[in-house]
């Protein structure tokens, strides 16, 4: 994947501090991140969605969908594409708040695909090293905001939204992802847990409270009159 060119925007938060919204497929990350983007529009806070657009149309192929329908053939190319896309995120968007991160790509998705045998064991150490190297270019002091939701509810939400490329995702896979998320974030250094079974408004309010508490400078842009 060719790295994209362009100016790197200034950050709102101190260098190295990034809030990463994490959680299983279907837990509500995109909805939350879009709400935060609306709240801070024009304030200089860089809120960045997961770079799915770079995965669903790369050289004419939907690598996200292929990673589900043909994991043996596409799990490794897809994960490498994910890492490249996060390099572009850092260079062109320089996030203060971001949806997922290179760490979850390695600690969750690569680990699950390794356990399923679709990523060779010999490839895992190199992929983990690359993911963590990319992460260090984005954040040296990440705070993980973890949206907790049972995999059964994640599946119900996925089926309702019927997003392109997700038809091949089943409950067993979601359970594996959930287990890996729990194992990783139970021992991670800086994690804020959020009950994602609450209403959209309650989740947004809870996350705003966390962000303002963790860095008071975010209070002004996040507590302006809601545009939601």
Swiss-Prot record:
Reactions accelerated catalytically: thymidine + ATP = dTMP + ADP + H(+)
Sites where the protein binds substrate: 68, 79, 109
Top-level EC class as recorded in UniProt: transferase
Enzyme Commission no: 2.7.1.21
Taxonomy, superkingdom: Viruses
Keywords recorded for this protein, A-Z: ATP-binding, DNA synthesis, Kinase, Nucleotide-binding, Transferase
Residues where ATP binds: 23-30, 157
Pfam families linked: dNK
GO terms assigned for molecular function: ATP binding; thymidine kinase activity
Keyword Nucleotide-binding: yes
Catalytic-site annotation from UniProt: 50
An example Gene Ontology biological process: DNA biosynthetic process
InterPro entries from the UniProt entry: Deoxyribonucleoside_kinase, DNK_dom, P-loop_NTPase
Similarity-based family: Belongs to the DCK/DGK family.
PANTHER family per record: DEOXYADENOSINE KINASE, DEOXYNUCLEOSIDE KINASE
Name this protein carries in UniProt: Thymidine kinase
Organism the protein comes from: Ictalurid herpesvirus 1 (strain Auburn) (IcHV-1)
